[in-house]
């Protein structure tokens, strides 16, 4: 008799994806972040669901409903801070996951990679709309500034912004629709993640060497289930330390002031995970140019397979490309720091140089270095 795990229509899908899945024997801890992202997503949906039970999406009551959650709801403060800091963990895992893909050439799985880029955009949109919901000062002004960027689109820009706002400024209609979208998008993300996984399982996982591992596969369970559980425990530990000891470490103090359209905060800035893109946006004096650079900074990921000029898939045996990769990481950290600084003398020029370097490394230096490495192999 066949095991029910292998014969039942529903169990069979789970079995082929998480139990009997053939996995490369040499994938490192950098491959843990896909499962961590799945855990983050489920976690965010659950905490978000409980927050939505007590939240009201009205400009007059939104701020006080969040205060009510923190003060009056049983363990409401834990749920709220788990959700807020869970978003930070989500983005840390996302950035590492994308970085892993760049380093080991995982972008050569075209469908998986492109759906991954769409997922990144969707998660960023969801996080942005979630940041607006508490209706604090930074929520309101962040929403105003970021939605206003669309007015840079020629001809239809102004109409588009007013259509998104549902009026002539960020107001009740905007908050209500942002709550609706923030609630529905995580389920869209879940569906996209399933498709992402579907395409990945068509080809099988990449591995650190970038060489086919078909001749050396091991079952996903128990080897990688156990490894993923260890990774999840580490992530939970970091998240709980953050939530229980310094829940506001990554937040903005301005968001503890109720939204006031008549009073602009001295420094409008988004959450830390958007600062690198915000720095690129600010580094260009022209509004439309800045918006295009902002979109290009993420959309550039779609070009990665076309910019791959190396004969080797992975960077494991390419020291020159490795140097460039870590330069790119350092550059992104610099951009993140600059995005949180005021627009004044040393920061403006540092931001502009870091922005130029970001595009230069990806579009010019990496492909050229790969060609040089190809020629070095002939020696």
UniProtKB/Swiss-Prot annotation:
Binding positions (a ubiquinone): 201
Signal peptide bounds: none
Entries under Pfam families matching the protein: Cytochrom_B_C, Cytochrome_B
Principal place of residence: mitochondrion
Domain of life, per lineage: Eukaryota
The keyword Membrane appears for this protein: yes
Record keyword NADP present: no
PROSITE patterns cross-referenced by the UniProt entry: CYTB_CTER, CYTB_NTER
MF terms (GO), sorted A to Z: metal ion binding; ubiquinol-cytochrome-c reductase activity
Binding sites annotated in the UniProt record for heme b b566: 97, 196
Sequence positions that bind heme b b562: 83, 182
Spans through the membrane: 33-53, 77-98, 113-133, 178-198, 226-246, 288-308, 320-340, 347-367
Keywords, sorted A to Z: Electron transport, Heme, Iron, Membrane, Metal-binding, Mitochondrion, Mitochondrion inner membrane, Respiratory chain, Transmembrane, Transmembrane helix, Transport, Ubiquinone
Localization terms from the record: Mitochondrion inner membrane
Cofactor note: Binds 2 heme b groups non-covalently.
GO biological process annotation, one example: mitochondrial electron transport, ubiquinol to cytochrome c
CDD domains: cytochrome_b_C, Cytochrome_b_N
Family matches, as InterPro entries: Cyt_b/b6_C, Cyt_b/b6_C_sf, Cyt_b/b6_N, Cytb/b6-like_sf, Cytochrome_b, Cytochrome_b_C_euk/bac, Cytochrome_b_N_euk/bac, Di-haem_cyt_TM
Necessary cofactors: heme b
Cellular component annotations (GO), alphabetically ordered: mitochondrial inner membrane; respiratory chain complex III
Membrane topology according to the record: Multi-pass membrane protein
Additional notes on this entry: Heme 1 (or BL or b562) is low-potential and absorbs at about 562 nm, and heme 2 (or BH or b566) is high-potential and absorbs at about 566 nm.
Family: Belongs to the cytochrome b family.
Role description: Component of the ubiquinol-cytochrome c reductase complex (complex III or cytochrome b-c1 complex) that is part of the mitochondrial respiratory chain. The b-c1 complex mediates electron transfer from ubiquinol to cytochrome c. Contributes to the generation of a proton gradient across the mitochondrial membrane that is then used for ATP synthesis.
Subunit structure of this chain's protein: The cytochrome bc1 complex contains 11 subunits: 3 respiratory subunits (MT-CYB, CYC1 and UQCRFS1), 2 core proteins (UQCRC1 and UQCRC2) and 6 low-molecular weight proteins (UQCRH/QCR6, UQCRB/QCR7, UQCRQ/QCR8, UQCR10/QCR9, UQCR11/QCR10 and a cleavage product of UQCRFS1). This cytochrome bc1 complex then forms a dimer.
UniProt protein name: Cytochrome b
Organism: Sus celebensis
């Amino acid at each position: 008799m066949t095991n029910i795990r292998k014969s039942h229509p529903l169990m069979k899908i789970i079995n082929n994806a998480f139990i009997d899945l053939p996995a490369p024997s040499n994938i490192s801890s950098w491959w843990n972040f896909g499962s961590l992202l799945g855990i983050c997503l489920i976690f965010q949906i659950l905490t978000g669901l409980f927050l939505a039970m007590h939240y009201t999406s009205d400009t007059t009551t939104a701020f006080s409903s969040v205060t009510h959650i923190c003060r009056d709801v049983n363990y409401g403060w834990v749920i709220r801070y788990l959700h807020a800091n869970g978003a930070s963990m989500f983005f840390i895992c996302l950035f590492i996951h994308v970085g892993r893909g760049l380093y080991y050439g995982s972008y050569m799985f075209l469908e998986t990679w492109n759906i991954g880029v769409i997922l990144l955009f969707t998660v960023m949109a969801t996080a942005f709309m979630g940041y607006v919901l508490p209706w604090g000062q930074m929520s309101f002004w962040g929403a105003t500034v970021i939605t206003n960027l669309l007015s840079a689109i020629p001809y239809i820009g102004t109409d588009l912004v007013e259509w998104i706002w549902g009026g002539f400024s960020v107001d009740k209609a905007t908050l209500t629709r942002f709550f609706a979208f923030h609630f529905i998008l995580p389920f869209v993300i879940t569906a996209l993640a399933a498709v992402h996984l579907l395409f990945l399982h068509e080809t099988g996982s990449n591995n650190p060497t970038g060489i086919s591992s078909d001749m050396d596969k091991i079952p996903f369970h128990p080897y990688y289930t156990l490894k993923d559980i260890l990774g999840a425990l580490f992530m939970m530990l970091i998240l709980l330390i953050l939530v229980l000891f310094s829940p506001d470490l990554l937040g903005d103090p301005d968001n503890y002031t109720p939204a006031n359209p008549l009073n602009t905060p001295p420094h409008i800035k988004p959450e830390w995970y958007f600062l690198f893109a915000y720095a690129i946006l600010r580094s260009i004096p022209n509004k439309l140019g800045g918006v295009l650079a902002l979109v290009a900074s993420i959309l550039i990921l779609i070009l990665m397979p076309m910019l791959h000029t190396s004969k080797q898939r992975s960077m494991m045996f390419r020291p020159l490309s490795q140097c460039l990769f870590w330069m790119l990481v350092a550059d992104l950290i610099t951009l993140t720091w600059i995005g949180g600084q005021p627009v004044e003398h040393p920061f403006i020029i540092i931001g502009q140089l870091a922005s130029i370097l970001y595009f230069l490394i990806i579009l010019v230096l990496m492909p050229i270095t790969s060609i040089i490495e190809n020629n070095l192999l002939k020696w």
